[in-house]
Amino acid sequence: MTENKLDTSRATEAIKDARFVEALSLLESNLTKDPKHIDSLYLAAVSSRYLKNYDEAKKYIESLLSQAPDMGRAYQELGHLNRDTGNQENSIAHYRQACELNPALLSSWKALYDYFRTNNNKPAADHAFMQMNTLQSIPSVLLYISQILNEGKLGIAEEKCREFLKKNPTNTFAMSLLAQIA
């Protein structure tokens, strides 16, 4: 698994602004330098899916999963890809796997909730709804910290959590995250 210092910040901003062609160009440049760069593979899969280049998105995800087989966000992206290509059953299986690996993935919980509610599985829908509400109640930066913490990125998670606590010293969720990291 490669997590070197290739910069993905410009590509991330481009994705947030729905500039997927630009993002993909930046990410492909990164992947030329390091074809196993985890964040670049993930973001390239996201960009490709938004551009409806589903075969390319799948290739990026497959490469990503060969490097990081326990990355919940990769399974979430695989869920999105299957959803967008009309394969609902596979998408649900991938969303479930994503949530098992990383319980802080709000999009996966939302997809599971919608599926279970539509299929009249009340206990499962209630559980997904509870998870969704919990995740929606915390600030987005803490949700991000939870996600990367679940991926084992302890250093980044600790740094971001300490930054947040400097501005919000009484936030108990942030305190509990920092305790988990320690």
Task: Annotate each PLM feature.
Residues 16, 50, 84-85, 118-119, ...:
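Register position in tetratricopeptide repeats
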Residues 35, 69, 103, 136-137, ...:
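Short coil turns that delineate tetratricopeptide repeat
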Residues 40, 74, 108, 140-141, ...:
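TPR alpha-solenoid repeat register
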